[in-house]
Amino acid sequence: MDFPLANLFFVPSEDATAFGRRLRAAAQQAPIVFDTAFGMPILLRKSHITTAYRDTATFSTRMFQAGILNGGLAAMQGDEHARMRRVYNMFFLPRAVSQYEERFVRPISEQVVDRLAGKPRVDLLEDFAMELPRRVIGELFGFPAEKLHETDERVRAMLRGLVRMHDPAAVAESQRAYGETLGLITEVVERESRDTSDTLLGEILRTLKAEHMDTIEASRQIVLSLILGGYETTSWLVANTIHALLAHPDTLARVRQDPSLLPAAIEEGMRWCPSSFGVLRMVERDVRLDDQALSAGTVVCLAGIAGNYDETAYPSPEVYDIDRKPLPAANVFGGGAHFCVGAPLARMEARVGLQALLARFPGLRAVPEERPSFMYGAKDSVAHGPDKLPVLLH
């Protein structure tokens, strides 16, 4: 393999569109590049990525079997994955998501917004975009409130080890954080198994029992998988959508006046300023994609978000336009058999939280002299987003 070298990810910019435009520019030069900072080949061409999503025998997630996700949904293949995926899907059916909205997300959103009231100025990244998913995860799984912030840091450490698997220090830190988090997960699972509640964790235990899979290990793996996906995905989705709206006051005014536009604002936000870098796959056999050769055993990144700035799909892609028809494809959730199972919850959480925020603070606006900087790896995460979101509330 001899691909052009690139540095696509760890590049800060005050322009929220720089990441997407940089990936698109790279895709126009070569279908596959080797990112020197990321340490792996990056697939940029849509046809190659579609092939990789569909051909799970050639492009697998088997590399996760060697780490903290071993035994979890992300590491499973074939029939085993299909069976467990069916179990996971039960937790995110429309009826279930609607119940989470009314019982957890809506009241928590109001509580988080209440805590902002009376402050003339806040950082919506820390005080809202991070706080909302943190609180929701805590309630859904019954985590003690005093454990939420340290769990947040451990989740980031675990994710860094999963994504930067070529970095021994990141992997070691991930394993340490995993051991600490596993103790907390075991504690809440054992407590819930003695007295099953109406939380998501209670629903998980009841479902596993009905499927004759009710073991502590199965429960722990599901909780771990959902925590790893639930924190970062939603936090950065919310943060990037907030920035998109603040940067476009006319659109912000429209959405505030008509909250039914929020789903479009969120979907376009995921295109305009994507939080995800892509997804990882392991090449199981020597394969050629057109004239590009990939060797068995290579871990690659499928950067589907390179298509977010494809002018043929999205005219004037640098423009944040919530009236695009059809709505942009949400590449941040991956694709194929391993498409993010919690996407309905993340979308709902963003919609409900943003609606509460905009309704409470009609004077919400950015602090003009403090522009956030955007980068993949913001705040030591594995996401693309801002380092801050300073706003005036009134």
Curated annotation (Swiss-Prot):
The keyword Nucleotide-binding does not apply. Heme b binds at H81, R85, R281, G335, H338, C340. The production of regio- and stereoselectively hydroxylated steroids is of high chemical/pharmaceutical interest. Mutagenesis can change the selectivity of cytochrome P450-mediated steroid hydroxylation, providing the basis for further experiments to engineer the biocatalyst toward novel steroid hydroxylation positions. Gene3D superfamilies: Cytochrome P450. Its EC number is 1.14.15.19. Its cofactor is heme b. It catalyses: testosterone + 2 reduced [2Fe-2S]-[ferredoxin] + O2 + 2 H(+) = 1alpha-hydroxytestosterone + 2 oxidized [2Fe-2S]-[ferredoxin] + H2O; androst-4-ene-3,17-dione + 2 reduced [2Fe-2S]-[ferredoxin] + O2 + 2 H(+) = 1alpha-hydroxyandrost-4-ene-3,17-dione + 2 oxidized [2Fe-2S]-[ferredoxin] + H2O. One of its GO terms (molecular function) is heme binding. Keywords: Heme, Iron, Metal-binding, Monooxygenase, Oxidoreductase. Hydroxylase that can catalyze the in vitro conversion of the sesquiterpenoid nootkatone, a natural organic compound produced by some plants, to at least five hydrophilic products. The native ferredoxin reductase FdR_B and either Fdx2 or Fdx8 ferredoxins can act as the redox partners for the conversion of nootkatone. In addition, acts as a steroid 1alpha-hydroxylase, when associated in vitro with the surrogate redox partners bovine adrenodoxin (Adx) and adrenodoxin reductase (Adr). Can use their derivatives testosterone-acetate and 11-oxoandrostenedione, but not vitamin D3 and 25-hydroxyvitamin D3. Belongs to the cytochrome P450 family. This is C-19 steroid 1alpha-hydroxylase. It comes from Sorangium cellulosum (strain So ce56).
